[in-house]
Amino acid sequence: TQEELLQIRKQPELEPERDEASENSRLALEEMGICAVPFYKTVEFSENLAQKECARLEAQLQKAGILDALVVSETDFNCIRKSCPEFLDTVLYAHETGNGTFEGLQVSEELDAALKETVYRILTNLYEAEEGQGISLGADGWFRQGILTGRADKEGEPEFVGALARKRRKELKIRELESKICCAK
């Protein structure tokens, strides 16, 4: 547990668990100079959402396979498709701007212009009601992505969407481990 605590303290942020193939694919993209950012780092929750709504929305994104999917520019998307036969991960990419009016998420201001444009296109393909070709994320926890439909909810706070949420999650994990270590002595 002491070792785990040291490892967590060294990490800038805690990330969702990934399989080895995804980790290797992300390292390969980085080595190729491809900017690939997990979706949860490209967006922030809208200010008008309550904490419970944020947690539910994050749970929907996670269950639908969207939360940790990579966001890339159009150029990098085409490069991955053509030049990375070993790529084994998920990319969230919208070729065209949609007409979705989903207001639960907004583009992070920290992104470069190309990624901002990509995230904007993704967000315009999100809907609150089940309509259109995009992804629906209902306020009641139901979601639809193509033929995949489900419902998600989460107690507590969001853990990944938003820099503050990621910081709080890391601090909480450190406190939990410190408490375990202290109790074990």
Regions found by a protein language model. Name each.
Residues 1-23:
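Extended, EK/Q-rich alpha-helical coiled-coil segments that serve as long dimerization/scaffolding arms
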